[in-house]
Amino acid sequence: TMSLLHRLSLAQKFMILGLLALVMVAFPAALYLRLAFQGAAQAERQVEGAQVLGEINGVIQSSQKHRGLSAGMLGGNVQLEQKRPAMASALAQGYDKVERALASFHAAPQTVSQWAEHRKEWTALEQRVASKQLQAPESTRLHTELIDHLFLVGEGVLDGFGLSFDPRVDTHMLTQAALVKSMVLTEHMGQMRARGAMYLAQGTLPPEGRATLQAGLRQIVLAQADLQRYLAKANADNAAFRKDLEGPARALDEQVGKTLAMT
């Protein structure tokens, strides 16, 4: 595998990074609900908030995938064009799930209206992509703007459901690592995936494109360090967290490190 990866172009390596990001975000998030809330240490409202945020993060991840597929399609990649409609359909379902969760758990009216507004943005963007009214860079920019908006809704959920104000340091740090920092890292990696897909489809990587990818690489390194720092803080005074998180965190660090070293 290594020899194959070494033969890949810079753009292809960044696409692999983006795919890796979608796998790795699951590890802290999956452990999060089980670890943070065992023994009913947290208020029920916080548990509900974590469930809502999990659904929002799912929409963000699907949006990141759709951004990459769209960039490839608009750049002329027929294979990615064939995969895109299924991802668009999954995204529509994801928006539905969040809508239901917000209603079910009585989220703040402002959060509900923000979500409805962003769903309209998504519908308009998807139609423009499907009819190929956009160039790949513009599609990537609009997807990224929408994803930024979804992050802000997630931040509102953190505050509204009391997840931002946990008095326990260990669960607060785990909340930040699993529900915020890991998603920031996947977003930087997802942006690289979209750019990589675009350059691959175009069959060229101009100097300014290489500079953009290298700048993105620096952001990934910083975001990865940020995530690991918060995981270490969560582990510091909690043996249960340490037992369950240290191994996966180390494996994640090594995997990302190896992939970055190839670029």
Whereabouts are the PLM-identified features?
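Hydrophobic alpha-helical segments
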Residues: 2-263
